[in-house]
């Protein structure tokens, strides 16, 4: 990692380097939703790199203290947010719980696993926020269990309009360590993509559901956006 970079650019640089994020404007990936996307993100790869894993943990702790104040507990979202959530909880000396993607079919049929008697104020840890559907489903499960969700932190977000609206409607504040615009900025610097690729990649975020069509019909040379804050 380049020590001269600010934290958001530094994390973006490393995600690209270890191929946790892959960009390909010509051969798109297919998401579970059916969307064709020029980006694929697997932040679980960061867990295999101790230096970056530690840096992410430190940035999460700083962000939680700064943005939300110290909570009673840390909650991880299965599965990508569990390991990072445990590391954050350990660093902060806090209890840890996690939220399943679906209730168990046996036993207590829990959605939330862990001891909920140790506090009610929770900050949620995610590895990735895309549309926000699964992340906010976890928030709903925590609220149903009687928790007060102070906010959510994630390693990365695409900052899609649909996610921003969903988080606003759910009254959940999200703080991401890095995001799509910052990633593209670093990808240009490190020559992972060309300026021509950049125009197509920016158009994807405008209308991800219809991106292959708009990428083919819109002219190149989109006006650059400022990195999201």
What residue ranges belong to the model's regions?
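Short, well-ordered alpha-helices that flank and scaffold nucleotide-derived cofactor binding pockets
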Residues: 62, 66, 86, 90, ...
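PRPP-dependent phosphoribosyltransferase catalytic core
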Residues: 2-13, 17, 140-229
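Conserved coil-to-alpha-helix start sites within the AMP-binding
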Residues: 80-82
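Short, glycine/charge-rich flexible loops or terminal/linker lids adjacent to PRPP-binding catalytic cores
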Residues: 85-123, 131-137
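Short glycine-rich phosphate-binding loop at a beta-alpha junction
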Residues: 69-78, 153
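Active-site-facing substrate-recognition patch
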Residues: 1-69
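Conserved acidic residues
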Residues: 72, 120, 150
């Amino acid at each position: 990692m380049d020590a001269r970079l600010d934290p958001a650019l530094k994390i973006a640089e490393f995600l690209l380097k270890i191929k946790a994020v892959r960009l390909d404007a010509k051969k798109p990936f297919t998401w579970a939703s059916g969307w064709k996307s020029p980006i694929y993100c697997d932040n679980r790869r960061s867990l295999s790199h101790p230096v970056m894993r530690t840096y992410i943990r430190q940035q999460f702790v700083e962000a939680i203290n700064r943005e939300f104040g110290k909570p009673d507990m840390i909650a991880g979202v299965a599965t990508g947010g569990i390991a990072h959530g445990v590391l954050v909880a350990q660093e902060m000396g806090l209890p840890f719980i996690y939220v399943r993607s679906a209730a168990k079919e046996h036993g207590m049929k829990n959605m939330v696993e862990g001891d909920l008697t140790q506090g009610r104020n929770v900050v949620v840890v995610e590895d990735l926020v895309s549309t926000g559907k699964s992340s906010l489903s976890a928030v709903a499960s925590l609220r149903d269990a009687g928790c007060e969700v102070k906010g959510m932190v994630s390693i990365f977000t695409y900052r899609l309009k649909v996610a921003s609206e969903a988080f606003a409607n759910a009254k959940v504040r999200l703080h991401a360590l890095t995001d799509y615009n910052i990633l593209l900025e670093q990808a240009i610097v490190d020559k992972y993509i060309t300026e021509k690729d950049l125009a197509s990649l920016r158009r994807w975020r405008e209308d991800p559901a219809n991106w292959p069509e708009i990428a083919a019909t819109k002219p190149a040379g989109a006006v650059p956006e400022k990195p999201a804050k």
